[in-house]
Amino acid sequence: MAMTLIVLAATMGNKYGGLKQLEGIGPNGETILDFSVYDAVRVGFDKIVFVISRHFEQEFKKLVSGKYEHVVDVEYVYQDVETIPEEKRNPKRTALYGSVRAVLMGEELIDAPFGVINAVNFYQRESFELLYNNLVALKDAGYHSFNVCYRLKNVLAESGGVTRGICEVDENGYLISVTDRTGVERISSK
């Protein structure tokens, strides 16, 4: 059974002003995406589906394809406003339709449990281990999905507001609800 990781990489960071997912940050120019793919492959993922935009397809593939295709199966799907059926499309909308729509772009390539990450977020290896191990256990566990969550204080930007899904869980750790909050920011205790 292939263990697939869907990487959401179609958005261009408006606040950042460019393709944050392709910006080198490591000592040898590694991107956040490089660290994620490395950790995902090390824990057992053997297929990566990148959800990208046709607007930067060539640049993305040039920087990504050669790095990963020799160690993991790589496929691409596209998320653009044009992928919405015309009768359901808002003609005034230029922004992408969100993470769920992005994941649906890859549905024809998925035939087993899969994980989803954002290309611009840093996930520690332990997160990939938790994700992978729970995906392997899904069939026998009696549930169909799960969420790897983080404490809010650990996922806030140093400055400025962000949008976060706030998860409510019960005493057993089961998800009760997710509420989208915008403008969430760190407040100094000084």
Regions found by a protein language model. Give the residues of each.
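Short beta-strand-to-loop acidic/aromatic patch adjacent to the donor-nucleotide binding site
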Residues: 112-122
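Structural beta-sheet core signal
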Residues: 5-7, 50, 116, 145-148
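Short, electropositive alpha-helical surface patch
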Residues: 59-71, 128-137
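Conserved core of the sugar-phosphate nucleotidyltransferase
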Residues: 125-190
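Short phosphate-binding loop-to-helix
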Residues: 68-113
